Curated annotation (Swiss-Prot):
Organism encoding this protein: Bos taurus
GO biological process terms held by the UniProt record: cell differentiation; regulation of DNA-templated transcription; sex differentiation
Pfam family membership, one: DMRT-like
Keyword DNA-binding attributed: yes
Keywords, in A-Z order: Differentiation, DNA-binding, Metal-binding, Nucleus, Sexual differentiation, Transcription, Transcription regulation, Zinc
Gene assigned in the entry: DMRTC2
Record's protein name: Doublesex- and mab-3-related transcription factor C2
Length: 370
């Protein structure tokens, strides 16, 4: 056999004789074998022991319709490989799409700082300039009233004006409960232009006060509980009387606060009565120089009231017409005319410690509260 014909015989698929391969030189056999191994061959033909190149062999394959066990396995493997290739291509397409969307989203953040500079900066974050002070954190319950943009006033920094909620004080003042008070709370006192107000607070037996010369009505007199009475210099005397039943004996009134109020007839509104805490006896007298006669007549009326405190009726003198009303803290008020007691309410019930109001003609009225 001619050696030049051996390559053609070797590449023929129908030729199965290998006797000429042993006769061929060893150097000439390596090159064709390497070329055959590199070229793809048909799998169906290879299962049946036939080596055929794939180029142009798909339509000419002799085992294309074979359904043997080996050919079925080859078909299944081809289907799996085709599905894997399709899945890999789909994943690559999705990955490319996600990458493009991520690039578009990543391009948006560089524009965010330009928008932040136009608005208000966040609290505690610097905008890049050293002369801007950090803004303090605002609580949720505080509402800012004014905000200055950092772009206009960078030297001063943002200014925050806040108004925290404040509790408004109630106009009611707590007072200790007393026998005359209806409750524990009383409304605040109203300011009234009363010309003469005299309050006598007693805890110990009452001190008899007698007129003495040299008293100035424009001054204030405070009397201690124990010791001699102070002396004052003035041109008008002062007349006072003890509040007890006896002239010099101990007081029969209970140990509560007593208030003596001198009120003119022209005052339409009554004074607000507030309880006072028990303390040392003191007398505060404030009046004008033109009303010293009113004080004198009031003291004389108290002297007459002391003598007739147990009597059912009190008749004033003809020269000084007056009316007296006894007011009980828990009972209805009663009033009397110029001739005597004429109760307006259903009944007149005096108590051991009543509140007495004395009206002195045109001069005014006196209220004694105990």
């Amino acid at each position: 056999m001619d050696p030049s014909e051996m390559p053609a015989v070797h590449h023929c698929p129908s030729d199965s004789a290998t006797g000429g391969e042993t006769r061929a030189p060893q150097g000439m056999e390596l090159i064709p074998r390497r070329a055959v191994r590199r070229s793809p061959t048909c799998a169906r033909c290879r299962n049946h022991g036939v080596t055929a190149h794939l180029k142009g062999h798909k339509r000419l394959c002799l085992f294309q319709a074979c359904e043997c066990h080996k050919c079925v396995l080859i078909l299944e493997r081809r289907r799996v490989m085709a599905a894997q290739v399709a899945l890999r291509r789909q994943q690559e397409a999705q990955l490319k799409r996600h990458l493009t969307q991520g690039l578009m989203r990543g391009a948006a953040p560089p524009r965010a700082p330009s928008r932040v500079k136009k608005g208000v900066t966040q609290p505690g974050v610097h905008s890049g300039k050293e002369n801007i002070a950090p803004q303090p954190q605002i609580p949720h319950h505080v509402v800012p009233l004014a905000l200055t943009s950092p772009g206009k006033e960078n030297s001063r920094g943002p200014l925050l004006l806040s108004r925290p909620p404040e509790a408004l004080p109630l106009p009611w003042t707590p007072m200790p409960p007393g026998p005359w008070a209806p409750g524990h709370w009383l409304p605040p006192g109203l300011s009234m232009p009363t010309p003469v107000v005299c309050r006598l607070l007693c805890q110990e037996p009452a001190i008899p006060l007698h007129p003495f010369p040299g008293f100035d009505p424009g001054t204030t007199l405070r009397l201690p509980t124990h010791g001699p009475l102070p002396t004052c210099t003035g041109s008008h005397p002062i007349l006072t009387a003890p509040l007890s039943g006896e002239s010099q004996g101990p007081s029969t009134l209970p140990r509560t606060c007593s208030t003596l109020i001198l009120q003119p007839c022209g005052t339409p509104d009554p004074l607000l009565l507030q309880p006072q805490a028990p303390g040392p006896s003191r007398l505060t007298w404030t009046s004008a120089s033109s009303e010293w006669q009113l004080q004198r007549e009031a003291a004389e009326a108290l002297v007459g009231l002391k003598d007739s405190s147990q009597a059912p009726r009190l008749t004033p003198g003809p020269a000084n017409p007056a009316w007296i009303s006894l007011l009980h803290p828990c009972g209805p008020p009663a009033a009397a005319g110029g001739r005597g007691f004429q109760p307006v309410g259903p009944s007149l019930r005096p108590s051991p410690a009543p509140s007495v109001a004395l009206h002195i003609g045109r001069l005014g009225s006196i209220s004694l509260l105990s």
